[in-house]
Regions:
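Alpha-helical transmembrane segments and their helix-helix packing motifs
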Residues: 1-228
Length: 228
C-alpha cells in the first residue's frame, strides 16, 4: 500500500475538489453553448468548451475519478480507497460551482439546460442500460484523452489535440460523465433511488470503459515480453 502522510491526503482531496470545480466550469460553458446556439454547432462548441476542464486537470495534475480509473489494473486493492474519496471530492467541487452559479446572472439559463439534459436521460424507459453503456463509452474517451498527454509527444503528435478531441466527441455524443452529471442532478433537484441508481450505474460504466485501454496495453506488454 502506498503510504500517504496526512498532508498528502489533504492535498489529494484538495486537488480532487479542484478537479470537480474544473469540470463544473467546463460543464457550465457547455450548457450555455447548448442554450444559446443549439443544434450540432452548439454541441461541438460545447464539447470544445467542456474540454477546458479536462485540459486544466491534466495540466495541473488534479485528481479526477474518471481519470484515476485507468490506474485500476495496477492500483492494488489497498489503494482502491482513493477512488471513492476522489469521486466524493470531485462531487464537492462540482457542487461548489453549482452553488456559486445560483447567485450568478446565468443561473436560470444553466438550470433549464441542465434539467433538460439529465431529465431526458433519467426518464427514458431504458435509463439503466443507457447510463451503464453511455458511461462506458465516456470512460473510454476520457482515458484516451488523459493518456494522450503521455503517448502523443512520443509519437510526434499534438498533445493538445489528443487531449481535447476525445472530450469534444464524448460531449457531442452526450455520453455520461459521472462527475459532470452530479452538477446536472443538483439543478434537477430530485432526490430518489432512481437518481441514485443512475449515478451509480454511470460510475460503474465510467470505470468499465476507463480500464479497457489500460488492460489492452498491459496485454500487449505481456505479449511483447513473451516474444523476447
Amino acid at each position: 500500500m502506498e503510504k500517504m502522510t496526512a498532508r498528502e491526503v489533504i492535498v489529494f482531496c484538495l486537488m480532487a475538489i479542484f478537479a470537480g470545480i474544473a469540470v463544473g466550469i467546463g460543464g457550465t460553458a457547455s450548457l450555455i453553448s447548448a442554450s444559446r446556439m443549439g443544434g450540432g454547432y452548439g454541441k461541438i462548441l460545447g464539447g470544445l468548451l467542456f474540454s477546458l476542464g479536462i485540459y486544466s486537470i491534466i495540466s495541473f495534475e488534479m485528481k479526477l475519478f474518471t481519470g484515476m480509473v485507468a490506474a485500476i489494473p495496477k492500483m492494488g486493492v489497498k489503494n482502491m480507497w482513493k477512488l471513492p474519496v476522489c469521486f466524493v471530492c470531485n462531487a464537492l467541487g462540482v457542487a461548489l460551482v453549482a452553488v456559486l452559479l445560483t447567485f450568478s446572472p446565468i443561473y436560470a439559463e444553466v438550470k433549464v439546460e441542465a434539467v433538460k439534459l439529465i431529465g431526458g436521460k433519467l426518464h427514458s424507459n431504458t435509463w439503466a442500460l443507457n447510463a451503464l453503456c453511455s458511461g462506458a463509452l465516456c470512460g473510454i474517451l476520457i482515458t484516451m484523452s488523459i493518456w494522450a498527454s503521455h503517448y502523443a509527444p512520443a509519437k510526434g503528435l499534438s498533445t493538445t489535440v489528443g487531449v481535447i478531441l476525445p472530450i469534444v466527441v464524448f460531449a457531442f455524443c452526450g455520453f455520461d460523465h459521472s462527475v459532470a452529471n452530479m452538477m446536472y442532478f443538483y439543478f434537477l433537484g430530485e432526490v430518489s433511488w432512481h437518481v441514485v441508481g443512475y449515478i451509480l450505474l454511470s460510475i460503474v460504466g465510467n470505470a468499465i470503459g476507463g480500464v479497457l485501454l489500460p488492460l489492452v496495453v498491459m496485454l500487449r506488454g505481456t505479449e511483447k515480453d513473451k516474444s523476447v
